[in-house]
Swiss-Prot record:
This is Foldase protein PrsA 1. Its EC number is 5.2.1.8. It comes from Lactiplantibacillus plantarum (strain ATCC BAA-793 / NCIMB 8826 / WCFS1). Belongs to the PrsA family. A lipid is attached at C20 (N-palmitoyl cysteine). Keywords: Cell membrane, Isomerase, Lipoprotein, Membrane, Palmitate, Rotamase, Signal. A lipid is attached at C20 (S-diacylglycerol cysteine). It is found in: Cell membrane. The gene is prsA1. GO terms for cellular component: plasma membrane.
């Protein structure tokens, strides 16, 4: 299927298909290139067709779900990426042929598509139970990262005598090689089972800890040796207490599932009263409009 705005980079939405005519797009010593010539050339290419598909989908999504996606939401997601990439953010945008404006357009399109997924996909009890198996609530930990096993042993010996948060903080400042967190006692931002920043070994070890507990042996990861201490673990509790979180995680997974997205886009376009006026492009949505499928996470 075509990729519907689910990545940072993609086809830019600046190509305009409407209003093509005799206006000159470019001129050369060999003659002019008009909008109509440009349009005729582009509509026959895969990138040109992809842009039109995307524009059609965006129009329908805006009509159906535009009121559910605010500028504030787009800005919040934009700032998250900006913070993640730091000083290299502008370079990353440029390398992907994006500007602040076009990137925010993509983020908005992605949020609109997510609203469509939430609307069109039925989440079954079976799906909730399956997600519950891997679910872990957000926890807050502090950690000490060291390069050598001997150093880890030294830290663990000190913790055997005093495993308090104050002492762990002191040890983190002295030994940790994680320069971004050591001065704050190794404290990390809260995370749950959907976290992809830390290794599976790190996450597994962390989620096993109760408040005040620490890993009594170092966790070996690709970064070195990790010693983790739990600051706050609310406990998993009952599934019924976390239905909203479970649904959110399922929808997030659906956004990476091409089959689910295919079905959702098909439903959205079928309900969008789409009419293709150019005969050369009449079949551009055939793979979506000709299929009949049901969407459910089960």
């Amino acid at each position: 299927m075509k990729k519907w705005l689910i990545a940072l980079a993609g086809v830019l939405l600046t190509f305009t298909l409407a209003g093509c005519g005799s206006k000159t797009v470019a001129s050369t010593s060999g003659g002019k290139i008009t909008e109509s010539q440009y349009y005729s050339s582009m509509k026959g290419t895969s990138s040109g067709k992809q842009v039109l598909q995307q524009m059609i989908l965006n129009k329908v999504l805006e009509k159906d779900y535009g009121s559910k996606v605010s500028t504030k939401q787009v800005t919040k997601q934009y700032n998250t990426y900006k913070s993640q990439y730091g000083s290299s953010f502008s370079t990353v945008l440029s390398q992907n042929g994006l500007t602040t404006k076009t990137f925010k357009e993509q983020l908005r399109s992605n949020l609109l598509l997510k609203e469509a997924v939430k609307d069109k996909v039925k989440i079954t009890d079976k799906a909730l139970k399956k997600q519950w198996k891997s679910y872990e609530p957000k926890v807050t930990v502090q950690h000490i990262l060291v390069a050598k096993s001997a150093t880890a042993d030294k830290v663990l010996d000190a913790l055997k005598k005093d495993s308090s948060q104050a002492n762990f903080t002191k040890l983190a400042k002295k030994y940790s090689t994680d320069t971004t967190t050591k001065n704050d006692g190794g404290k990390l931002s809260a995370f749950d089972n959907t976290n992809t920043s830390y290794s599976s070994k790190f996450l597994t070890a962390a989620f096993k800890l109760k408040n005040g507990e620490y890993t009594t042996s170092a966790v070996k990861t690709s970064n070195g040796y990790e010693i983790i201490r739990m600051i706050k673990n609310p406990g998993k509790g009952k599934m019924s207490d976390h239905t909203a979180d479970l649904k959110k995680q399922i929808w997030d997974n659906d956004m990476s599932d091409s089959t689910v997205l295919q079905n959702v886009v098909s439903k959205v376009l079928k309900g969008g009263n789409v009419s293709i006026k150019d005969n050369d492009l009449k079949d551009i949505l055939s793979s979506y409009l000709s299929t009949s499928s049901s969407s459910s996470s089960n």
